[in-house]
Amino acid sequence: MSRGNELVFKAKKTSEKISENIHIFANDPSLAFFRVQEHVRKVTPAIFEKRDEVFQLQNNLQGHCYDMEYGIQALRTIEKSESIFENIQEMIKASIFLKQQLKYEESRKKVKKDSTKSSVYKRFSAHLALDLPDLPDFGGVMRETSQRMENMIGPGTATGRTEAQAATSSNPGELQRSYTTLH
C-alpha cells in the first residue's frame, strides 16, 4: 500500500498544481485588468489637467488669432487712408504758408504804419534838403491872419495860443513845411 499511497499522493499533488495553474490562467486576465485599472485611475487626473490646459491654450490661441486679424484689418485700413493723410499734410502745409503770409502782411502793415508816421516828414524833408530859394518873410502876413482868425473865433481864445503856434509864428518857414508834410 505504500505504493498506492504514494501514487495517490503524487496524483493529488499533480492535480493541485494543475488546479493552481488553471486558477492562475483564469485569474491572470483579471489581474491584468486590475493593473490596467490601477494605472488608469492614477493617470486620469493628470490627463484631465493636460486636457484642460490644452483647451485653455486653444482658447488663448484663438483669441490671439482674432487679435492678429483685427490688427491686419487695421493696417489695411491705414494703408487705404494714406491718401487722406497726404491731403491732411497738404492742408497743413497750405495753412502754414497762409499763416506766414498773414504774418508777413501784418508786419508789413505795421512797418508801413510806423514808417508813415515817422518817415513822411523825413521823405519830404529829404526833398527840401535841396537848395531852396529864399522865401520871403511871411511872418507879418501870418500874424495878421492869425489875429483875424482869433477875432472871428472869439476874444477869449486870442490870448490862449498854444506853444506850437508860438513856435511856428517865430519861424514861418517851418510852419509852411509842416503844413505841407501833413497834407
UniProtKB/Swiss-Prot annotation:
The keyword Membrane applies. It comes from the Eukaryota. It is found in: Lysosome membrane. Keywords: Lysosome, Membrane. Disulfide bonds: none annotated. Residues 152-183 are annotated as: Disordered. It holds the Pfam family BORCS8. One of its GO terms (cellular component) is BORC complex. Residues 159-183 have a biased composition (Polar residues). InterPro entries: BORCS8. Transmembrane segments: none annotated. May participate in the coupling of lysosomes to microtubule plus-end-directed kinesin motor. This is BLOC-1-related complex subunit 8 homolog.
